[in-house]
Each structure stands twice: as structure tokens, then as C-alpha cells.
Amino acid sequence: MPLGGDRERLSLSPRDEALIQAVCSANPRTIVAVMAGSAVIMEAWANRAQAILMLWYPGQEGGHAFADVITGEVNPSGKLPCTFPARQEDLPFFDRSATKIVYDLWHGYRKLERDGAAPAFPFGFGLSYTTFSYAGLKLARDELRASDALEATVEVTNAGAIPGEEVVQLYVAAEGSKVKRAPKELKAFARVALSPGETRTVRLSVPAADLAYFDAATSGWVVEPINYAAIVGRHAADPDALRARFRVI
């Protein structure tokens, strides 16, 4: 096996992609189940499939779980733990023969957002058989000390016709930092189960210490006294995410 892994590309093999294209042409109501351990580039065929299920490596009960999802016995609520790029070039350079590589901050959703590259499927993305709406993002305080915690609440409603679960995600963006920082980073999340039409208040908490960056000059963590934005949404690239500003003093 070549050093560094067993994949030459992030897309499926040409033979697999041709098979998917042929099956989708014969039956537009095709569901594609992908079993893999990391991101897969699907741009060549994703818009042809009726649905795509990312199975990962589900083990011996994976077939039963897959059947439960596609028959509606279970309403899916999983969220991606990584970014699925639209192009392999959007990710950091990868040398299969390297014995060491340094990514620094710039990988995953942090790199794509910095570069203005739209992902195929963002970090934290995942669909359901129902839909959820977000409203009324509120912060308990808009000024925090480094010893405090950011406390946020948001109203989440199941706007569909069946019960479902949503994973509410809170990202924080540092505004005007004196060091290079990611455009935003996930800092908290919460899972909520909702009946059709039900609305619940979801609470999210982030210790101000979690906003720190590591200062190599002092070998310590620093919470900058600057403005920040709390961003609450469905995934890292949610265009409808709610925002509220606060400041660390």
C-alpha cells in the first residue's frame, strides 16, 4: 500500500461514476448509498440522484439501519463531521509519499470559507424528512469578561408534518483580531427533538475561554478583548443563519 493511504482521488472510480449515471438515467428515483470513511467528491453525479445517503462504515447492522431510513421508519438527523468539497483542489495539497505535513488552521470549512470556495456539502450539513425554522436569537449579555460564558437562546420550530430531530450549531467569528484566525469556528451545538408544529427554546453556552487563541510568543492562551459574532444555523455555510454581536472586555 502506498504511504499515506489507499485512495488516489476523492471522487469515486470512473467505473462507479459511470454505473451511477447509467442507473440514474434508467430510473430518476434512484437513491445512492455511499460507504466510505471520509469525504467523497460527488459533483459528477450528485444532481442525478433522488437522494444520497452517507453510510460511513456502519457495521453489521448497517443494512437494517439503511432500510429503516429509506422506508421512513426512522427520520434521519445525522450531520456531517467534515466538509465535502466540490473540487479536490479546494483542499490542502496532499502528498501521498510525505511522512509529515503541516495544515496549520487552514483545512476543512475554515480553509474553504477563507478562500471563498463553496462546498458541495458543508460541515454540519444533513437533511431530514421534515424541515426546521430558526428565529429569535438572543444573547443573555452583549459584554463578557474572559471568565464569563456566552449564553445564547434560539427558537427552533418543526415546520414539517412528522417528528424529527435537529442539531442546532453555534459558530463564533472574531472581528478585528490581531492574528490570523478562521472566519468562524464551531463552539457549541445541541440536539433537539420536535413534534410537528412544536417550537422549543434551545440554549447554547460557550465559555469565553473557548474563544482564545494560542500565543506562541508567551506560550499561553489569549482571549482577545474585541467584538465577536455569534452565528446560529443548520451548518457551517447556512445562508439563513442568525447572527448577534457581543464583545469581550
PLM-predicted stretches and their roles:
Residues 1-249:
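C-terminal non-catalytic regions of proteins with extracellular/luminal or membrane-system context
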